[in-house]
């Protein structure tokens, strides 16, 4: 079983990650030295706990987002993905292939004036009751 982390450890680690994300690594010893440099942590065990939790969060951040931590790099990446516009629309097709039954249905619904409809022959299947290998 793991230990319960206090609110102090969690808050300190999150703040350190948000401010110094580029300096932190996935290595505990490196993160311990960085925590020692950038923050005034009163005791050695508390410093180790904060560095350990920061390392834990960095490993989680490698795979996905962590709730409560907003990193500018991730926000920029998310914004870039949201604003992406493809050069060729996936919805625009010049030719729509339909079989004769679908063409008749479109005529009945008064959609026979759609541009780009191309009549194709339906693919024939073996039918029912046949032997399967």
Swiss-Prot record:
The keyword Ribosomal protein applies. GO terms for cellular component: cytosol; ribonucleoprotein complex; ribosome. Pfam families: Ribosomal_S17e. GO terms for molecular function: structural constituent of ribosome. Keywords: Ribonucleoprotein, Ribosomal protein. GO terms for biological process: translation. Belongs to the eukaryotic ribosomal protein eS17 family. This is Small ribosomal subunit protein eS17. It comes from Spodoptera frugiperda.
């Amino acid at each position: 079983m793991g230990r319960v982390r206090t609110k102090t450890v969690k808050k300190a680690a999150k703040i350190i990650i948000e401010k110094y994300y580029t300096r932190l690594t996935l290595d505990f010893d490196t993160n311990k030295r960085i925590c020692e440099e950038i923050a005034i942590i009163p005791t050695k065990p508390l410093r180790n706990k904060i560095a350990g939790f920061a390392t834990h969060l960095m490993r989680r951040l490698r795979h996905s987002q962590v709730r409560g931590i907003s990193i500018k790099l991730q926000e920029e990446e998310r914004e870039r993905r949201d604003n992406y516009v493809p050069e060729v629309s996936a919805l625009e097709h010049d030719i729509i292939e339909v079989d004769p039954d679908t063409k008749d249905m479109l005529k009945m619904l008064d959609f026979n004036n759609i541009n780009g409809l191309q009549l194709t022959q339906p693919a024939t299947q073996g039918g029912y009751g046949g032997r399967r290998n």
